[in-house]
Amino acid sequence: SVGFKAGVKDYKLTYYTPEYETKDTDILAAFRVTPQPGVPPEEAGAAVAAESSTGTWTTVWTDGLTSLDRYKGRCYNIEPVAGEENQYIAYVAYPLDLFEEGSVTNMFTSIVGNVFGFKALRALRLEDLRIPKSYIKTFEGPPHGIQVERDKLNKYGRPLLGCTIKPKLGLSAKNYGRAVYECLRGGLDFTKDDENVNSQPFMRWRDRFLFCAEALFKAQAETGEIKGHYLNATAGTCEEMIKRAVCARELGAPIVMHDYLTGGFTANTSLAHYCRDNGLLLHIHRAMHAVIDRQKNHGMHFRVLAKALRLSGGDHIHAGTVVGKLEGEREITLGFVDLLRDDFVEKDRSRGIYFTQDWVSLPGVIPVASGGIHVWHMPALTEIFGDDSVLQFGGGTLGHPWGNAPGAVANRVALEACVQARNEGRDLAREGNTIIREASKWSPELAAACEVWKEIKFEFPAMDTL
């Protein structure tokens, strides 16, 4: 007779362990599970734990060669989602030995690699991860972090201002550089390559880098402030990406940029290491995130992608606006903004935070608010995001009726007015419009901007609710 019982078996016999006490070294995951009709939630939760760790669909004799009890993921708790029929939050604990040190790539391959196509589930969404301190310590994280960035730029006590250069595709390198110069000269701290500007026939990367560097130094000399332009180093291969980052460093640029989801975590971590070793700041764009995080019941929540980026490394990351054209519910957005910036974040289900997360002094990432925002949004943005943020106005700068530099002036005046008002103890939420109006009396550039955008709102109901 065979030494083991062959055949298909219930996952829940092995992988559903409600009495399990989670360890400090476990990676904990909260999955939103929608089982197929007739599949009990315990079985669905156990199936997730099994398929994302040691399980397979049938008993195999090689199971006897290792200790499954030591290596298996376990579903240790299941709770129904309030207000949703047939949706459950399944909590799964993974032993740390299942993961390679310092590899976000491996962490995701294990936790979300195969299980999302699983037939017994109608849909599956990873809502949050608790990353244990012992695992965090194997990552280098952001190349510099918030404090070092402020020291490098010598800018304190206010949010930083940015602008994406538009039209995003089609400008020649020289005209592109000119737009960069005008924005920086007018008072912005940063300008940005669009995420899809890499190295196309109308503007090769090296030409763009040269003209942007020239714009940068000219604006710096004239304003006496340190300026930056996010030079997009994203490329088709890791070698080419590093080549671009090296060129940026040689030109004396302070910051480069990467599309971390389309580029991939392996490339991103390599670039982050290069940036740390060579004193470059790293701006991260989240192109492709909505493919992964927009559906409420399937995929991954952005807070997981944000945590992963903090491990992999980046000094800035786009984080929605709460007020512009791109989605973001206020409490939920602030939840993952705290996860990016703070050293310790308490569990708070009302903000979508399923686990207490201790970052053990890993540097923080500055959230970037970008997308459909303009001067009238400034009080709200200053209040919501606070000082450690980058507020990025693309159309809100370049759409100014008098041109780029006046557009930049308008934004800088609005920002300084909001910061001053806040420091004087005024209530930005209530008095925001008044503050902007008062400031526009002594800034014709701001007055013109207020006039253009006074009616524009992007109001749709948000998708991202708890």
From Swiss-Prot:
Stored SUPFAM superfamilies: RuBisCo, C-terminal domain, RuBisCO, large subunit, small (N-terminal) domain
The protein's role, per its UniProt record: RuBisCO catalyzes two reactions: the carboxylation of D-ribulose 1,5-bisphosphate, the primary event in carbon dioxide fixation, as well as the oxidative fragmentation of the pentose substrate in the photorespiration process. Both reactions occur simultaneously and in competition at the same active site.
Post-translational modification (record): The disulfide bond which can form in the large chain dimeric partners within the hexadecamer appears to be associated with oxidative stress and protein turnover.
Annotated catalytic residues: K166 (proton acceptor), H285 (proton acceptor)
Subunit structure, interactors included: Heterohexadecamer of 8 large chains and 8 small chains; disulfide-linked. The disulfide link is formed within the large subunit homodimers.
Protein name per its UniProtKB record: Ribulose bisphosphate carboxylase large chain
Co-factor note (free text): Binds 1 Mg(2+) ion per subunit.
Binding residues annotated for Mg(2+), in chain numbering: K192, D194, E195
Positions that bind substrate: N114, T164, K168, R286, H318, S370
Annotated organism of origin: Gonopterodendron arboreum (Maracaibo lignum-vitae)
EC annotation from Swiss-Prot or TrEMBL: 4.1.1.39
Transition state stabilizer, annotated site positions: K325
GO process terms (BP): photorespiration; reductive pentose-phosphate cycle
Cofactors: Mg(2+)
